[in-house]
Amino acid sequence: MTLSTNPRTKQIAASKGFDLGRNHGVLNSNVEYTRATKNPTSPYTSYSRTGLALNYQNTFAKVLRFNFGVTANIGGMNTEDDPDAQKGEWEKVRDNVLRANTSLKWLLNRSWITSLDFDASLNYTDNLARKRTYNLNSTSLPAVHAEQEGYYIAEMLPPVYYSTKYVDSKQLDYAANLKATWVRSWGDVHSNAKVGASWRANGNVGDGEYYVTPSLAPNGYRPRPYTDIPYMHNLAAYVEETLTVPLGSATLQLMAGLRAEKTFIKNTQYENTSSLSPRFNLKFRINDRLTVRGGWGITEKLPSFNVLYPLPEYRDTPVFATNYGSGQSAYVYHTQPYRILYNDNLKWQRNRNSEVGVDLRIGGTSISLVGYFNRTKYPYKLSAAFEPFSYNMMGVPSTLPDGTAYTMPANPAFRVDSQTGEIFVRDKDNPSAGWIAMQTTSTKRTFVKNTYQNNGSPVDRMGLEFVVEFPQINPIRTQLRLDGAYGYTKYVNEGEACYYPSTSTGGEFYPYVGVYLDNGGSSNVTYNGRKLHALDMNLTATTHVPSIRMIISLRLEATLVKRSQNLSEYRGREYAFNVDEDRNPTGGSIYDGDSYTAIWPVAYIDLDGNRHPFTDAEKNDPAFSSLLLRSGNAYSFNGDGYDPYFSANLSITKEIGDHVSVSFYANNFTNSRPFVASYATGVKAVFTPDFYYGLTVRLKF
């Protein structure tokens, strides 16, 4: 039995094993109850969970090892009426889980196969979130819920109302794996070959997000049942060979493997959803005190599900608005569904990793060093694509066709042609007057933004990791362990990013989109790369006190180096340039720091969708001045970083008799939370964790 407590969580768990007798196997069981509060000083939001786990194991005919397990959790979150919250608001979550797994190992021990392993699993998560919210506005607001392209009259939300939102998620996943192992020996040469296949399916059979009263759903909401989203199936096959060869007193171990994967999603536009990942490892054990090892591998990663199967989004553009009666309003919007665009030039992201390590023992001290270099090619990023878009703005006519003045009725009825956008108004109190057409006041030309999955420039990462374990200091029975890691990362994005200024002239939208070196498409970012390096170290002291059956562990965590530098480079030259607050060039290198910086586009797109190079003529034309992007501060290219900071964790375990053990832990037990200032901005921040503690009691019967 285990009892655990900390300021937010209380848990009790008990486990018991049952021997079912000769040849009947073993049954292990576990039950636990957990209750957690979000804020101990205001426990109005709480989470509780009751869990039960059963596992059965048996061996049949000495060659079939069978295992079956099932786990069930029943829980949820509940927000009671908080006196500090709006009365009537609440939030509840149902969180139930059912997991089942089985495995079978067949010890064949034949000349052509040693063993065959099979396992399968099913995971079902039933999560229903319900939230009731109080909404207060100064006036009625429009809400658009149309799902087809066209023109629609917006629904009007009342100024004051309650809305209840449901999010119904029923994640249902399956998996199965099959592996064959073939172990062979030729004298002192040993071979361990594996070949296997796996299948995994991930999907959701829930109803998704919906509202109890659909007419009170917020602006922009559209129903999206999860059952409309297809399952994602992944099929993988792999082969691996490990060969151990003695070389005198030394031993050489070679491992080579290849993994192929294929992802299947119904109706995806990406057909070649397959990847191939080879790897190779070498381990040369020279003697008991020295081992050298190395590895190389390539891993391909497919885009996320939302890229392979993009879900619909909606663009709602207001085209008509009018007031009538006693403060009432009517709005018409043009709705345009869109998705993440298909990119037929998209390449799969590829990580190539190489590492070299050495393990040595000097006296009683063990040392492990690993150096690595990782290059990510074709990293994924979402890019923006702008295309010209025009629409008609409608307004109330000042006169009727016969020349008489027209005023909006106090009790009007509205009708809109969803295809043409024509709007008609009729007086409900005088239907015989007929439908009056609203007039086109202007045609707006602008750009709309679409996104697509793209590839960025390579990202390089390299570093060194080490572990030093010192021999025990016998007089105080204490062992020290020092570990740390140094990492360096650099990338320069030489792709493109688009930015569309939000400025307007004479009521018209800006007529150009700027195309820049990839600054993320931001209006105030002038860098397209970054380099970072960091050094973290930890020192752990573990003391054993056998006389009182106690173990004390003290861990000091230190971040000694944390540095970064923004970069602006293109073909070996600085892309950004220094400017003053009025955007006038000032000269010098951007890396001198303490200066505003700016960038010009490399190209621009006009309202006809044509792309043009951006030349000195455009730089000197005031019509293009809005395409000059200036940094939001004068320290964008100052070297940044922080002074070292530290924290310490304490753990104590005490055994009481043969049946009870008590464990206490305290993270950052000195409550060291210093403010450290940024070298670039001077802004201070705290990076060490909050002081946190807990107690666990274990009972053995």
What does each of the following model-derived ranges do?
Residues D228-S366, V370-R375:
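Structural signature of Gram-negative outer-membrane beta-barrels, strongest in the C-terminal barrel
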Residues R22-N28, K62-F68, N109-L116, L128, ...:
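Repeated loop/turn-to-beta-strand initiation elements of outer-membrane beta-barrel proteins
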Residues T376-Y378, F386, T559-A634, G639-Y645, ...:
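C-terminal beta-signal and adjacent terminal beta-strands/loops
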Residues D117-S121, K131, R293, G325-V448:
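Membrane-embedded beta-barrel scaffold of Gram-negative outer-membrane proteins
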Residues T34-I113, N123-A146, K165-Q171, F691-Y693:
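Flexible loop and strand-edge segments within Gram-negative outer membrane beta-barrel domains
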Residues L247, G395-R571:
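Gram-negative outer-membrane beta-barrel transporters
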